[in-house]
């Protein structure tokens, strides 16, 4: 069904990414506050990133409190809008799929194509902003670790490898009462991969820890050593989360060379040079990371878990389900983080 009647009122721009704008918006019928991401499809790479995000989020059959929820995706062409469905044979949708596959525009360039993603609205910025503008809090650290491990276990259970986990891509929803810890939501699935079943039993879900990918992508300071090589599985997400948790616990920061913004992220220091952890481990798999770097002491189990997550050998890292269980055990069995 094609319609020209808008369902949403855009209130203000709240974010600007590499391939789209994000607005705060209201649902006209209910007044519900939502986030709307607008992506112009004038470049094949924009189309590919947008479709990857759509395919990943639309493949999820249930919701998780720590994963951004896609309410709907609307395709707009020259003023006409249509709700986009995965696998649709729509004359508006198919040219976008062809553009993504071929790497060149497969529709009339005179037409204006846009994709609108309607998602949860998060009012607390991203994880970088939240952590780095507040005093260190054990309670917050514990809450965030449990939320992120739960989100990753959910994604891997749904055969989704994120491939670009970093604090910038983790959004914060403030608690209503201002007392409880905020809710984190993993977002930005433009580089994600939905693993499909293969082998003798196509009905059996794909094992993301045995599904090998070859496209080296992500953000260098969070990339696992095997991603730099171009042969990796979902264990690369475990490594990225290890960098995030390590940086959060010790307030380790890097500086974005373009924006000069301080970001949570781990690194290896070589003289005046700052090297991503994954790159350093690729060059020297026997490199022993200094964990903790800043704190005088760190919980023994947490220290051991971080070293496992950041192992150069992906086989030595826990999978997402093991990680979630280990963090629950650390959070609820150890009453102090200092022993």
Swiss-Prot record:
SUPFAM superfamilies from the xrefs? Protein kinase-like (PK-like)
Catalysed reactions listed for this entry: L-seryl-[protein] + ATP = O-phospho-L-seryl-[protein] + ADP + H(+); L-threonyl-[protein] + ATP = O-phospho-L-threonyl-[protein] + ADP + H(+)
GO BP annotation list = negative regulation of G2/M transition of mitotic cell cycle; negative regulation of G2/MI transition of meiotic cell cycle
The record's annotation in PROSITE patterns points to: PROTEIN_KINASE_ATP, PROTEIN_KINASE_DOM, PROTEIN_KINASE_ST
Organism's domain of life? Eukaryota
**Entry's InterPro entries?**
CC_SR_Kinase, Kinase-like_dom_sf, Prot_kinase_dom, Protein_kinase_ATP_BS, Ser/Thr_kinase_AS
Query: Which sequence ranges are marked TM in the entry?
Result: none
GO function terms (MF aspect): ATP binding; protein kinase activity; protein serine kinase activity; protein serine/threonine kinase activity
User: Known EC number(s)?
Assistant: 2.7.11.1
The record's Pfam families line, in alphabetical order, gives: Pkinase
Which cellular compartments is it found in? Answer: Nucleus
Where would one find the signal peptide in this protein? none
The alphabetical list of record keywords is:
ATP-binding, Kinase, Nucleotide-binding, Nucleus, Serine/threonine-protein kinase, Transferase
The residue ranges of the Protein kinase domain are 8-332
Q: Which GO terms describe its cellular component?
A: cytoplasm; nucleus
List, from the UniProt record, the residues annotated as the active site of this protein. Answer: 164 (proton acceptor)
* EC top class named in words: transferase
Family named by the database record: Belongs to the protein kinase superfamily. Ser/Thr protein kinase family.
Q: What is this protein called?
A: Serine/threonine-protein kinase pdik1l-B
**Which organism was this protein described from?**
Xenopus laevis
Q: Which gene encodes it?
A: pdik1-b
């Amino acid at each position: 069904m094609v319609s020209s009647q808008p369902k949403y009122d855009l209130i203000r721009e709240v974010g600007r990414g590499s391939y789209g704008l994000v607005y705060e918006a209201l649902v006209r019928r209910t007044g519900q506050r939502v986030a709307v991401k607008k992506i112009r499809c004038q470049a094949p790479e924009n189309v590919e990133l947008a479709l990857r995000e759509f395919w990943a989020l639309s493949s999820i059959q249930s919701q998780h409190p720590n994963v951004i929820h896609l309410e709907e995706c609307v395709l707009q062409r020259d003023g006409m809008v249509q709700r986009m469905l995965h696998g649709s044979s729509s004359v508006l949708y198919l040219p976008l799929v062809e553009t993504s596959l071929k790497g060149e525009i497969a529709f009339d360039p005179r037409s204006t194509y846009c994709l609108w993603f309607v998602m949860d609205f998060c009012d607390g910025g991203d994880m970088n902003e939240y952590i780095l503008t507040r005093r260190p809090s054990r309670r917050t650290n514990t809450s965030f670790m449990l939320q992120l491990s739960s989100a990753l276990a959910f994604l891997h259970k749904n055969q989704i490898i994120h491939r670009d986990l970093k604090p910038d891509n983790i959004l914060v929803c403030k608690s209503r009462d201002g007392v409880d810890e905020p809710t984190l939501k993993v977002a930005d699935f433009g580089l994600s991969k939905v693993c499909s079943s293969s082998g003798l039993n196509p009905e059996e879900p794909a094992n993301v820890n045995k599904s090998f990918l070859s496209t080296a992508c992500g953000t260098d300071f969070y990339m696992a050593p095997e991603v730099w090589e171009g042969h990796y599985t979902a264990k690369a997400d475990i490594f990225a989360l290890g960098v995030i948790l390590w940086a959060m616990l010790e307030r380790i920061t890097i500086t974005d060379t373009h924006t000069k913004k301080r970001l949570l992220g781990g690194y290896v220091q070589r003289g005046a040079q700052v090297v991503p952890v994954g790159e350093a481990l690729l060059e020297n798999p026997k490199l022993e990371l200094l964990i903790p770097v800043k704190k005088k002491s760190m919980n023994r189990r947490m220290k051991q878990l971080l070293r496992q997550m950041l192992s150069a050998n992906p086989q030595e890292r826990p999978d997402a389900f093991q990680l979630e269980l280990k963090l629950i055990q650390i959070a609820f069995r150890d009453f102090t983080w200092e022993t």
